[in-house]
Amino acid sequence: GAIRNLLKEGLKHLHRSSWPGVQALQQLAGLGDRPLVADDIGFQLAPRINAVGRIGDPVLVVDLLTAEDQDQAYELGRRCDVLNRQRRDLCDAIEAEAIALLDSDPSPLPPFVLLAQSHWHHGVIGIVAARLVERYQRPAALLAADGDGFMRASVRAPEGFAVDEALKHC
């Protein structure tokens, strides 16, 4: 509908944004000066922004998107880029550890994967849980310490599995 058309039109013009922060993100993502498509947003720009909220201070993104100076915007964008690489590395390491934990157990895989490690970063366990669902085709819950003495959980499940209903029976 109307929102979809508005987004399509906005994508056509985003690459010509006068905002230094948007320009910096596009440059760091290697998108050049061409019209953007949805995949550019979903796989290049959004992850750089999202990573900051997952493992850093979200104020960084506010500062980036409101920066008026190109050099300052580029430096802030570079910091977002670094956090995105760190986020990817964290996800890969946690996924490898989770797979090793599951594969090292000789018993059959349970119908619901549940893993907890205090050293995992709580900001990325949802991404890893989704990867485990894809790999093992069953619901997965990962828990990580939040730094305040509590564990945070993230649960993902295959399509058609109602996590909220399952949790009501716990």
Give the predicted meaning of each segment.
Residues 1-170:
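Hydrophobic helix-and-loop "lid/oligomerization" segment in the mid-to-C-terminal part
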